[in-house]
Regions:
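Short beta-strand/loop segment at the start of cytosolic alpha/beta domains
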Residues: 1-4
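Walker A/P-loop NTP-binding motif
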Residues: 106-112
Length: 139
């Protein structure tokens, strides 16, 4: 996995593929995971979701699935906001952590910090190599 903390308590990165990755998240102090992968993504990456869910539960990490391709940001941003409002340390991921999860993080910053999508993207990209889809952020 590759990841970084983009703002306090919010990490963006690539998908955990095996239970060992979840144990790494636990060591980092992650208390919640927001997974943006679709069922097709899981199939492609051969992720055993049942096994991963059990490992999250054993690790005392809450997991939220919000499967999206590259739109429907607003509902996802609200979910992310509610998870962070519960004081969780959140790991937000899609597949490679290059597009969807950084886009969601940018959208969250636009909504919460009331900054432009370009400023939000610059902030995240200064900490983490990614290519957020700025053209779909219309908040």
């Amino acid at each position: 996995m590759r990841y970084t903390e983009v703002i306090d308590r919010l990490y963006v990165g690539s998908c955990p593929l095996v239970p060992k990755d979840i144990k790494e998240l636990k060591k980092m102090g992650i208390t919640a995971v927001m997974n943006l992968q679709t069922d097709a993504d899981m199939l492609y990456w051969r992720i055993d979701w049942d096994k991963m869910t059990r490992t999250y539960e054993k690790s005392d990490i809450k997991v939220y699935r919000y499967p999206i391709r590259d739109e429907k940001l607003e509902e996802g941003i609200s979910l992310l906001d509610s998870i962070l409002a519960e004081e969780h340390k959140v790991y937000l991921h899609c597949n490679a952590g290059l597009n969807r999860s950084p886009t969601m993080a940018v959208g969250y910053l636009v909504k919460k910090m009331r900054i432009s999508r370009h400023d939000a993207a610059r902030l995240i990209m200064s900490r983490y190599y990614c290519e957020p889809y700025l053209d779909i952020i219309r908040l």
